[in-house]
Amino acid sequence: MDAHAKVLEALRWQADVTNDPLTAGVLDAAHADVFMGGATWHRLRPHAHLPTGAALALRLAGAAHRLALAGDAPAYAAHLPTCGGDGDVEAARAAFVALMADDRLDLRPVQTNEPGRLAALLPAFAAVHERTGLPLRLLELGSSGGLLLRRPEGIPVVGRRGCDPNPLDPSNPADRLLLLSFVWAGDLPRFRRLEAALDAAVADPAAVDACDAGTWLGAQLRGRTPGVTTVVFHSIVWQYLPPTTRQHVDLALAKAARRADDEAALAYVRFEPGDGVAETRVTHWPGGDERLLATSGFHGQDVVLAPR
């Protein structure tokens, strides 16, 4: 597949699966402009080599949204609900394509921290605690700003720590802007929820280390930690990890699993894509048994608990 066809496919797929009409609309307009060889094609052509998992269309939408949120794209912002705009999809399409000639567009790697996913993760944390009776030590891969490293109500947590190759600081205005820019510009409730989660993380911060997930997890799981259940978790992260990092994560878990016992248990919780939905799965050690705990939307909405 040549570069032009690859970019067209990336935009078409993202526009089709995005359930925010405004974001779907501007990506559809971008697709049409790329097809015609317009400014959007010239903007994206240098990035056409990126793999599918790099989410090129979301990088583009986030870059435009970031300019609007910063006050640097008023014509586009006028139509974005997240910027107080009117939500006019047709007007947003035209303004988006016009913005493609702006050299301030910065197609950063997608970095999200969706607090709504806690709705699907909390049942897993509760199930792990119910099974072991031990307080939890939470270790998150791909933590971003650490917004999911909260203290679940009613579940004792004795440690919270995460890692990310590029951790973001919820108290830093530039980092807040980056996270907010990857929310769909027409989804105001989700945008407000993220703002509230950023404020909560500032009030009760969790440590997030700048490190490769495989290297970091190997170090975190090196010793036995009696009296707690160590919970390794991640949410919509696996697709972004390089193959070598995935192998190192699997190896670290396998080594720790061999040491796990009833006094120092281990659980692996993941919220990742399934068949058209997100699946929350947990594997417990000792034992190594795996369960599907819940399905939901990819932002943690519409959680359905699996039968026990």
Q: What positions do the PLM features span?
A:
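A short N-terminal interaction module
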Residues: M1-M100, R104
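Short, hydrophobic/aromatic alpha-helical segments in well-folded domains
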Residues: A120-A124, A252
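A short SAM/SAH-binding and catalytic strip from SAM-dependent methyltransferases
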Residues: T230-P243
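C-terminal substrate-binding/active-site "lid" region of AdoMet-derived donor-dependent transferases
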Residues: Y240-E290
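SAM/dcSAM-binding transferase cores
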Residues: R281-R308
